[in-house]
Amino acid sequence: MDKKPCNSHDVEVRKGPWTMEEDLILINFISNHGEGVWNTIARSAGLKRTGKSCRLRWLNYLRPDVRRGNITPEEQLLIMELHAKWGNRWSKIAKHLPGRTDNEIKNYWNRTRIQKHIKQAEASFIGHINPEHSNEQASTSLLSSSCHADHAVESYSSSFNGNMGNNVQYPNHFPTESNDYFWSMEDLWSMQLPNNGG
């Protein structure tokens, strides 16, 4: 069953990426009339977008005071400090970082937390394979350079090839196409020890 407009004021709503033309219409409308009720702005500006879509586009991308570029080290420290204090209250945190949006801060936090967990897992994995490295280098990624990666594979191969009575082939290098030398699941599976149970 197709949805039909309830009255003559309902218009087909456009979804998907914003065009440069739509951005310019919204910027010009707000510069001439100011911010206000976003549903009214969307309709009055002639945009076939929802008020929410217009508000988010303006606040997160088009506002003149939105900062561009990477989060600075000072901002990183402030985000960590404020997150420890207020948790995931991104809007409250954003008020202390002029020009940064709550969404940008949330995305930054989630992205860096995931990277931190991956690096901890790598260090733990390497420490399990070669225990002498676990105490000295557990807090840093052993895979941050190809030198470390090659050493890790040599240690891995020599640890198991010498102690196993079979001729298992292990990779002599890690793939260098992946970002920051993260292992793919295929790489990890290919390094699994054969099942001794048969």
Swiss-Prot record:
Regions recorded as binding DNA: 38-62, 90-113
Give the Gene Ontology MF terms in alphabetical order. DNA-binding transcription factor activity; sequence-specific DNA binding
Where, per UniProt, does this protein localize? Nucleus
Kindly indicate whether the keyword Repeat belongs to this entry.
Answer: yes
Tell me which UniProt keywords the record has, alphabetically: DNA-binding, Nucleus, Repeat, Transcription, Transcription regulation
* Chief localization: nucleus
**What does UniProt note about where in the body, tissue by tissue, this protein is expressed?**
Expressed only in flowers.
Q: Write down the InterPro entries for this protein, in alphabetical order.
A: EOBI/EOBII-like_plant (IPR044676), Homeodomain-like_sf (IPR009057), Myb_dom (IPR017930), SANT/Myb (IPR001005)
Which is one Pfam family of this protein? Answer: Myb_DNA-binding
An example Gene Ontology cellular component term from the record? nucleus
Classification via SMART domains = SANT (SM00717)
- HTH myb-type domain location is 10-62, 63-117
Which PANTHER family does the entry link to?
MYB TRANSCRIPTION FACTOR-RELATED-RELATED, TRANSCRIPTION FACTOR MYB24
Q: What role does it play?
A: Transcription factor.
For this entry, the protein name equals Myb-related protein 340
